UniProtKB/Swiss-Prot annotation:
Similarity field: Belongs to the UPF0161 family.
Biological function: Could be involved in insertion of integral membrane proteins into the membrane.
Keywords of this entry: Cell inner membrane, Cell membrane, Membrane
Protein name in UniProt: Putative membrane protein insertion efficiency factor
Organism from which the protein derives: Nitrosomonas eutropha (strain DSM 101675 / C91 / Nm57)
Record localization: Cell inner membrane
Any one cellular-component term (Gene Ontology): plasma membrane
Main location: membrane
Topological type in the membrane: Peripheral membrane protein
Listed InterPro entries: Membr_insert_effic_factor_YidD (IPR002696)
Length: 69
């Protein structure tokens, strides 16, 4: 299941992600953060961390460097 989600993220990055201008306020980008969190922490915790990060990525958040814990 984890590999399926990582594959879907890669599909997004190499298809839709190339068609829209970059808008992520963080480094690494939210999609890279989710991939790394899933790889490092597994399915449940990785999804939790990635979802929290995506919810923080909005115009009222200053963004910046946000490494995976």
């Amino acid at each position: 299941m984890k590999q399926l989600i990582i594959g879907l993220i890669k599909l997004y990055q190499y298809s839709i992600g190339l068609l829209i201008p970059p808008s992520c306020r963080f480094y690494p980008t939210c999609s890279n953060y989710m991939r790394e969190a899933l790889t490092k922490h597994g399915l449940i915790k990785g999804l939790w961390l990635g979802t929290r990060r995506i919810l923080r990525c909005h115009p009222w958040n200053p963004g910046g460097y946000d490494p995976i814990p």
